[in-house]
Amino acid sequence: MSLPDAAALLQAAVSGLLLGAMFALAALGLSLVVGIIRIVNLLHGEQVVLGAYLTYLLLGMSGLNPLLLAPLAALLVAALSYPIERWLLQPVRRFGEEVPLLTTFALSVVVQNLLVYGFGGNTRVLDSGLGAARLLVGGVSIPTVELLGTLIAVLVCAAVQVLITRTAFGRAVRASAEDPTAAAVLGVPVRRLHAVTYALAGGVSALGGALLGMVFSFTPSSSVEYLLTGFAVVVLGGLGSVAGTLIGGLGLGLVESLSAAFFGDGYRLFTALLAFLLFLMLRPQGLFGRRA
């Protein structure tokens, strides 16, 4: 095995940071659901990959650039996510924490099989229409599609941060997360807010999946990888923290790209999850969490 030179390491680091922002956007939905609704959402991976597949479907129907179609796919996933939380997850929550977990697992199996039935198991990728267009900055080659995806991811993360921290909706959501019973007594529509939050989470996850689908190929089983990387990003950044999720995504992307530079693409996910497990042992509360 030959070690990469300094230029290759710099190229890998920049690529990792760009991809990490898209990882963060895809994982942000999981962070919102776990941090606010307090549900471990095993359907998250399917929501991410569904964003890529719906964009693929819309691309085949319209021929438009997938960068324009990705927000529409995200809205469709958000619209599908709202009734799932409102009419499937909320009724079973009173039976304990395990039942919503099992419900999302069952839904993930159903959705993955529907994707196999509808699209087959063949590998697909979204053609951004940008081809091999790149920017050359200081000797580093930056694919245009990755740069645009990163800009979109950062802007959406910033918008969600403002929504959660600076608006009346965000204050109500935070109140419902801290003490749902007290918030309901004060007139906060907790159930509706949880459903809207789950829809928002599904939408941003799907948008992240569509952006990643322009960089990586995907199949219905890619949902498992997205779920694992989502948990890694959320634990790294801390539950419910938008800034933490973004930094966690950047860190994970950096580890994946550098491991690919050293060991090859086949070890990308393995090395990232190994680093995640080591971090989990050393700092289980995440970068921005506090010890209980």
PLM feature segments, named:
Residues 8-60, 83, 87-99, 236-243:
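Single transmembrane alpha-helix segments in multi-pass membrane proteins
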Residues 4-16, 142, 164, 168, ...:
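Inter-helical junctions in multi-pass inner-membrane proteins, predominant
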Residues 1-25, 54, 65-69, 95-102, ...:
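Membrane-interfacial amphipathic/re-entrant helices at transmembrane-helix boundaries
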Residues 19, 141-219, 242-248:
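Helix-loop-helix "hairpin" substructures at the membrane interface of multi-pass membrane proteins
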Residues 1-9, 86-94, 284-292:
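Transmembrane alpha-helical segments of polytopic membrane transport and secretion proteins
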Residues 30, 63-107, 114, 247-252, ...:
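Alpha-helical transmembrane segments within multi-pass membrane transporters and channels
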Residues 8, 118, 178-185, 189-192, ...:
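Cytosolic-side transmembrane-helix boundaries in multi-pass membrane proteins
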Residues 91-166, 193-196, 258, 263, ...:
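Transmembrane helix-bundle core of multi-pass membrane transporters
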